[in-house]
Amino acid sequence: PRIPEDEERFTFSTVCRSNGLSSRLIISGYTQGSFPWPDAKDADAGLYPWGRLFPCTILKTGRVNLTHSMRRRVRDAVHRHYSGLELEILLDYDFDEVIEAIAEYHRKRSNGTWMTRDMIDMWKALHRQRIAHCVSVHIDGELAGGLYFTSVGRMLYGEKQCSPFVQTHPACSRRTGSLCSMA
């Protein structure tokens, strides 16, 4: 079968708009399969389009099985690429730093970012409510990459990730960049 081009892979369908964000609105939207995604023009106007992304990937974690050989391959790759470096993978350690780094990373890669200051502040508030979480990767004490996600009920909703450290640290390469992003 033919693999679609990047722009053909996903379709974002707007289902509604809101004039602001709140924890209640985020939770309600996520439980209905929708999430806010403003562009620069919407953000300047204070509007938040809510939509759905098709196709949507759902991983049933009860069925995920990391085989012994897969765990060994990951461990060996980490040892091979990070030998002599202090590597830490942390959960919920530095949410504010991670989300700010993600926003900056995506701002530099495009003309602006869909992550408005209001959205960043909202996810920080959701983190304080133990709804939003992060995983961060640190190399020699410096943030190397991270991701954040939202937990509502029994579902985890993956958000954005970044690996800004990959371009600057001599020990990082394209292969290790993928490991940082997957953290």
Predicted regions located by residue number:
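N-acyltransferase acceptor-side catalytic subdomain
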Residues: 1-183
